């Protein structure tokens, strides 16, 4: 795996070079403007190319060191692209309204995430039957509201190590919070925006759907490259990580899952999975789970049963998604 390639032609076809009307410009973007056409500022792509590459390298390096990337894009045309890209590379996202204090008041946000997980468990389990229909509807509405705001970060487990932003004007609160905490910011900065305080400025169109899709795809691929590099640096034998013949334990877990008697080659660092501590990793090992590929192949029900056995059923889907990403890059 390598850092994703892109060409100036791709940027042109996606409309990255189109800025805003010249009368709406921010003078601080003057160094990145090539000229004006029909009263529309044209971004200098000769600068965008190396600056975008620099941002991609920063994302890859951050993930390779075990860091978390938070995608932020709450405008309508960015919502789907941000969520899809973050999920594809097993990272995190905010694509609904940014809640003030998401970064600077993480303790309170963590309490809301805990409430979201509790509601997920209640509504998915038999406990929901003890409530009236009206009470269940109220709980479902509360759960849906929390999920819109926090669903993309509920498995983040702590502050991100870098945030990637679409539209710095709209996401100014998120950027201010990141700056207060010295969290690096990589952002698409249009001609009507202020590049001050952005760690990795990428001059370009932050409104066109095709441009946003291109940015998100490149950032996701850079994160996947970081995952691949992390596995290589940890000494994992890529050949040995291919699925071996199953060696069954004397006793299987209650899920019916058959684990291994021991790791095949070097065991994977399961603490890379969201919310997995050393104690949880030991519980996985006790069930015969030593490798990401074992979790990647679990179906929904089996994953949740195993999640219950290790004490974190609400994390099961996130574990499988992360394990799939890690396994895919190792093959």
UniProtKB/Swiss-Prot annotation:
PROSITE patterns tied to this protein: RIBOSOMAL_S2_1 (PS00962), RIBOSOMAL_S2_2 (PS00963)
Any single biological process term in GO: translation
Gene3D superfamilies in the cross-refs:
Glucose-6-phosphate isomerase like protein, domain 1, Helix hairpin bin
Protein biosynthesis in keyword set: no
Which InterPro entries does the record cross-reference, listed alphabetically? Ribosomal_uS2 (IPR001865), Ribosomal_uS2_bac/mit/plastid (IPR005706), Ribosomal_uS2_CS (IPR018130), Ribosomal_uS2_flav_dom_sf (IPR023591)
Family recorded in the similarity comment? Belongs to the universal ribosomal protein uS2 family.
Q: What is this protein called?
A: Small ribosomal subunit protein uS2
Give the originating organism. Answer: Bradyrhizobium diazoefficiens (strain JCM 10833 / BCRC 13528 / IAM 13628 / NBRC 14792 / USDA 110)
* Gene, per the UniProt record: rpsB
């Amino acid at each position: 795996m390598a850092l994703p390639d892109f060409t100036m032609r791709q940027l042109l076809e996606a409309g990255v070079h189109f800025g805003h009307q010249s009368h709406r410009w921010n003078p601080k973007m003057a160094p990145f403007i090539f000229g004006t056409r029909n009263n529309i500022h044209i971004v200098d792509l000769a600068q965008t190319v190396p600056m975008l590459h620099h941002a991609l390298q920063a994302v890859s390096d951050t993930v390779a060191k075990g860091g978390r990337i938070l995608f932020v894009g709450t405008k309508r045309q960015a919502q789907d692209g941000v969520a899809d890209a973050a999920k594809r590379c097993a990272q995190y996202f905010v694509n609904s309204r940014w809640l003030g204090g998401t970064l600077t008041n993480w303790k309170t946000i963590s309490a809301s995430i805990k409430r979201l997980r509790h509601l997920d468990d209640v509504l998915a389990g038999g406990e929901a039957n003890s409530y009236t229909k009206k009470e269940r509807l109220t709980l479902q509405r509360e759960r849906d509201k929390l999920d819109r705001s926090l669903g993309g970060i509920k498995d983040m487990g702590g502050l991100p190590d870098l945030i990637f932003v679409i539209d710095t004007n709209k996401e100014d609160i998120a950027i201010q919070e990141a700056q207060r905490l010295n969290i690096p910011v990589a952002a698409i900065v249009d001609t009507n925006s202020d590049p001050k305080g952005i760690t990795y400025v990428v001059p370009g169109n932050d409104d066109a759907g095709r441009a946003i899709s291109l940015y998100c795809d490149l950032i996701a691929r850079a994160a996947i490259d970081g995952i691949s590099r992390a596995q290589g640096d940890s000494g994992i034998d890529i050949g040995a990580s291919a699925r071996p013949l199953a060696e069954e334990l004397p006793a299987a877990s209650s899920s019916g899952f058959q684990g291994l008697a021991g790791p095949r080659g070097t065991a994977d660092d399961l603490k890379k999975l969201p919310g997995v501590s050393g104690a949880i990793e030991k519980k996985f090992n006790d069930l015969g789970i030593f490798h990401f590929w074992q979790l990647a192949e679990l179906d929904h029900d089996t994953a949740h049963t195993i999640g219950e056995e290790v004490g974190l059923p609400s994390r099961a889907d996130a574990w499988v998604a992360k394990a799939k990403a890690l396994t895919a890059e190792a093959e």
